Amino acid sequence: MIPTSFPPREEIARLTARMLLEIEAVHFRPQEPFTLASGLPSPTYIDCRKLISYPRIRSTLMDFMAVTLLRDAGFEAFDNIAGGETAGIPFAALVAERLGLPMTYVRKKPKGYGRNARIEGVMTEGQRVLLVEDLTTDGGSKLSFVDAIRETGASCAHTAVIFYYGIFPETIGRLQAHGVTLHHLCTWWDVLAEARASGAFDAGTLAEVESFLSNPRDWQDARKPADPTKSL
């Protein structure tokens, strides 16, 4: 059933953050930072893939995603819902079910040849495709999926994620320059606010996380490993 009532954005963000904290998808470790794929340190880590194992929370968040898309993009904005391999696939299927639309997924690498070599499922020329993923940091990884969709002759002007970092100011501009609008449920700032309200982490940890969120580049530069090729 297509939802027709729209909870306030702030309430969606707060409840999404609360659910992520409840299933322990959120990790704060400023004293022993995580290492990102870029090699840079981060005191924060989030695992949205855990959501598929919590049916009640998963269902609620997909309802939130559906109403966010209907409110912000429109009731007849899409013809096809595409998940990005791998994390986006289950969420794309759930969103497609709620919106009553076909579902496909986009491979990271091509399989075979032709303009549909990265697409699994039926995607046709002229379709308006929504790209669904679990999260985005700076938006960069989404562009490859968008390009693969457009190579089929379909259009892709929107991407939706459960979690958007919300700390790198270039993200929205990068996506907009590629003709893509980002839709999301919550950010690190929403998680930080809910973590403070619930007492999920100690005050010192939250203060250090806030320092990172306020200026992630400076925080990382101060803590990134020394270059072993440089002599003392």
Swiss-Prot record:
This is Orotate phosphoribosyltransferase. PANTHER family: OROTATE PHOSPHORIBOSYLTRANSFERASE, URIDINE 5'-MONOPHOSPHATE SYNTHASE. InterPro entries: OPRT, PRibTrfase_dom, PRTase-like. Orotate binds at residue 137. Belongs to the purine/pyrimidine phosphoribosyltransferase family. PyrE subfamily. The keyword Transferase applies. It comes from Cereibacter sphaeroides (strain ATCC 17029 / ATH 2.4.9). It catalyses: orotidine 5'-phosphate + diphosphate = orotate + 5-phospho-alpha-D-ribose 1-diphosphate. It comes from the Bacteria. Catalyzes the transfer of a ribosyl phosphate group from 5-phosphoribose 1-diphosphate to orotate, leading to the formation of orotidine monophosphate (OMP). Its cofactor is Mg(2+). Its EC number is 2.4.2.10.
